[in-house]
């Protein structure tokens, strides 16, 4: 849902064109979320959802960051958010398509705020890290970013991804028991093997660039879930270590502890889990400002 009390076309042409990409086949809950004020352009944040999810995954964070004074953009990633929960659109998702979209989102955010933050979850976390490597944004917060699969060793992930691309695409259920009965309120109940492999190609490119150059973002906070079941925490720590060799003072790793075995810690469908993680994620994206204490001498 776009929140606005002015002409987006007049002030933010790129943003208006992005919103227009939400065609009739996109579900109401799958549409790009925009919460902006015409009178405030100090801070903007882009929130990037995970694979097969939709912008509604970040609805609560979008609301709270807007209340904190941010202009907020939660874009619908390419080929996501269709009204048909069994849409085959993801099988056509490509790595260059995702990267081009992120470039567009960052440029839009620069129209919305002088200081830009990008945060994202899972595949959105991967894209956030990719943006952190390339763009001089103020802050980047990759949340449980997809740099590999938890049960596949890093050295094997590349060959596995390329093998997936040499065979026909397959769709797999996120929940093999519920299958299509799994709630699709925030996205598709399936993922595509080709989409997964193309996302990993972005991760490989990111790691190659990170070994050679420091991240362009002024501050990066990588967020990992200590009880992660899907993405590879070792790979997250590896990127953290690589980046810190370049800029140890501006890269940090925040590990969430005390959660049950889990991956999706942001979706409103898992409201108890998301509720526990929410304050930590909010503070990672918008850190509390130090309080100045006045002393009477």
Question: What label would you give each PLM region?
Answer:
Residues 119-128:
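Gly/Ala-rich beta-loop-alpha elbow adjacent to hydrolase catalytic centers
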Residues 83-112:
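Catalytic nucleophile-loop/oxyanion-hole region of alpha/beta-hydrolase
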Residues 76-83, 146, 259:
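Short beta-to-alpha linker loops that shape the active-site pocket of alpha/beta-hydrolase fold enzymes
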Residues 2-40:
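N-terminal cap/lid segment of alpha/beta-hydrolase-fold proteins
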Residues 27-80:
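Short, surface-exposed "cap/lid" segments of acyl-processing enzymes
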Residues 141-152:
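Active-site nucleophile loop of the alpha/beta-hydrolase fold
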Residues 38-39, 186-259, 275-295:
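Serine-hydrolase catalytic core
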């Amino acid at each position: 849902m776009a929140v606005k009390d002015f002409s987006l076309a007049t002030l933010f042409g790129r943003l208006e064109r992005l919103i227009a990409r939400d065609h009739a086949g996109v579900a109401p809950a799958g549409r790009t979320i925009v919460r902006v004020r015409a009178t405030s352009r100090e801070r903007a944040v882009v929130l990037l959802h995970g694979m097969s999810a939709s912008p509604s995954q970040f609805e609560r964070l979008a609301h709270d960051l807007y209340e904190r004074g941010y202009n907020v953009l939660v874009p619908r990633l390419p080929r996501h958010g269709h009204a048909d929960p069994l849409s085959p659109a993801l099988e056509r998702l490509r790595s260059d398509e995702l990267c081009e979209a992120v470039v567009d989102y960052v440029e839009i955010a620069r129209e919305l705020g002088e200081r830009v933050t990008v945060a994202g979850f899972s595949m959105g976390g991967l894209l956030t890290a990719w943006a952190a490597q390339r763009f001089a944004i103020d802050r980047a917060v990759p949340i449980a970013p997809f740099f590999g699969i938890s049960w596949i060793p890093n050295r094997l992930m590349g060959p596995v991804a390329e093998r997936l691309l040499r065979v026909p695409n397959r769709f797999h259920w996120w929940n093999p028991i519920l299958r299509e009965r799994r709630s699709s309120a925030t996205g598709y109940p399936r993922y595509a093997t080709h989409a997964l492999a193309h996302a990993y190609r972005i991760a490989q490119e990111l790691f190659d660039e990170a070994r050679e150059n420091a991240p362009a973002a002024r501050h990066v906070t990588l967020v990992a879930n200590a009880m992660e079941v899907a993405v590879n925490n070792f790979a997250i720590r590896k990127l953290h270590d690589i980046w810190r060799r370049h800029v140890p003072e501006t890269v940090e790793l925040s590990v969430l502890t005390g959660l049950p075995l889990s991956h999706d810690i942001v979706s409103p469908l898992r409201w108890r889990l998301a509720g526990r993680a929410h304050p930590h994620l909010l503070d990672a994206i918008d850190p509390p400002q130090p309080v100045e204490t006045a002393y009477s001498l």
